[in-house]
UniProtKB/Swiss-Prot annotation:
It comes from the Bacteria. It catalyses: CMP + ATP = CDP + ADP; dCMP + ATP = dCDP + ADP. Belongs to the cytidylate kinase family. Type 1 subfamily. GO terms for biological process: pyrimidine nucleotide metabolic process. One of its GO terms (cellular component) is cytoplasm. One of its GO terms (molecular function) is dCMP kinase activity. CDD domains: CMPK. This is Cytidylate kinase. Its EC number is 2.7.4.25. It is found in: Cytoplasm. InterPro entries: Cytidylate_kin, Cytidylate_kinase_dom, P-loop_NTPase. Keywords: ATP-binding, Cytoplasm, Kinase, Nucleotide-binding, Transferase.
Length: 216
């Protein structure tokens, strides 16, 4: 079974996807982290001037795909964790992900991971583009101010004000929704949930019965 969770940044996709995967004992794939891995690698001095085709053909990054384990990202065989949450990497990932060759490359990897077993995929175009026939599609929304407050918890203290981050998120939403290639849209047949005033437990209470009915 494939479950997709789409939506803009800060809506709780990662937290929900992890909790849902744990509840169902499914694999979990954070596709945003995959794009940020590419962005991080591309920002390194040794790779900034390398032609995109060569960068993707002999990448300095890699991912581990294994059953019953979250996807792990590596740069030159070194695990990546905190490097992927910087605002610089996030902003560049939003730009870099618009490249058709980058999206095609990533979608191939994501579909390969889906072949490993049942999985919860979170991102921005999982249900609309990559897995349009997923058994369950969820689209999360939330008020921009609440999303900014959540995102600030992941950033170094003092790196951005809540007001500045709110403005960045709104601008990114517009860019994601208006891009020509695979824009951020609500997938057909998706369950839309506003997470502004809901805990992850409350969201799980809404969706787990639906998923069990699809599994029956």
């Amino acid at each position: 079974m494939i479950i997709t969770i789409d939506g803009p940044a800060g809506t709780g996709k990662s937290t929900l996807a992890k909790a849902l995967a744990k509840t169902l004992q499914f694999n979990y794939c954070n596709t945003g982290a995959m794009y940020r891995t590419l962005a991080y690698a591309r920002l390194q001095p040794d790779w900034q001037e390398v032609p995109l085709e060569d960068f993707l053909a002999s990448p300095p990054f890699s991912f581990s795909f294994s059953k019953d384990a979250p996807l792990q990202a590596f740069y030159e065989n070194r695990p990546l964790t905190s490097e992927l949450i910087s605002q610089e990497v996030a902003n560049f990932a939003s730009i870099f992900s618009k490249e058709p060759k980058v999206r095609a490359y990533m979608q191939t990897l994501q579909k390969r991971y889906a072949s490993v077993g049942s999985c919860v995929f979170e991102g921005r175009d999982m249900g609309s583009k990559v897995f349009p026939h997923a058994e369950v599609k969820i689209f999360l929304t939330a008020e921009p101010e609440i999303r900014a407050k959540r995102r600030l918890k992941d950033l170094p203290e003092g790196s951005l004000s809540q007001e500045a981050l709110t403005a960045e998120l709104i601008a990114r939403d517009q860019a994601d929704q208006q891009r020509e290639l695979d824009p951020l849209v609500i997938p057909a047949d998706a369950l839309v949930i506003d997470s502004s005033d809901l805990t992850i437990s409350q969201i799980l209470e809404k969706i787990v019965p639906l998923i069990h009915s699809r599994l029956a």
